[in-house]
Amino acid sequence: MRKLVLTALIIALGACKTVPLTGRKQVALIPGAQMNAMAVDQYQQVLSESKVIKGTAQAQTVERVGRKIAAAVERYLTQKGHADMVKDFKWEFALIDENVANAWCMPGGKVAFYTGILGICQDEAGIAVVMGHEIAHAVASHGSERMSQGLIQQMGGVALQVAIKDQPEKTQSLYMTAYGIGSQYGAMLPFSRLHESEADKMGLVFMGMAGYDPREAPKFGERMAAQSGGNQPPEFMSTHPSHSTRIKDLNANMGEAMKYYLQTQQGQ
């Protein structure tokens, strides 16, 4: 009976979206506008409880790269007829002073980088690799997808609006874990390997369109592998395929990304 109720709920809400670039169908119980509104509150909460670095060369670099990737995303989606997917994004980029190799992007374009990952990035191109990957998660609504899955698993047949309005603490917990925001906010619910692979593929295209050489992505992967020393990868990479598989896949997906990159170099 529960499965029937859940199926009916999903159908009634028209809870199916398509991931740009890959074309994969996904479950999305929560409207994008609602996710974006929740992101504003949660993003401000994180920033208020963190040491945010402003005005330094590093902070300015993160902001600059973020703006270029965001512009590339908007350009790509416009070309594909999907400009509406990010029309309500209000991009923000914050650098948080914490020695963890982590970064994330909430719905609506709310991005955070942690200082602990900058050494692995090394330069703007490395930051673009991470930025493109994290923004791709938001564009592909991966967090919304796994939050929807969490609602189905944890709240059963409870109506969505009831779950959100009458169980705000549980909903907030699902939201925070769905976006993998630091351990102090609860256990991270990792992105699936499918999500990570999609974000890698999309991120390559976005960084290429922003004028950053996508061939830097496998190099970043090699530095990340060296950083992990064969142990558990840093938090934001925790559910990626193995380093060797990821690097192989990045190289395999290089063709389309390089096409966009070369166009930017030729002024097209």
Model features per residue range: what roles?
Residues 3, 16-268:
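A Zn2+-metalloprotease active-site environment signal
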Residues 4-12:
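Sec-dependent N-terminal signal peptides
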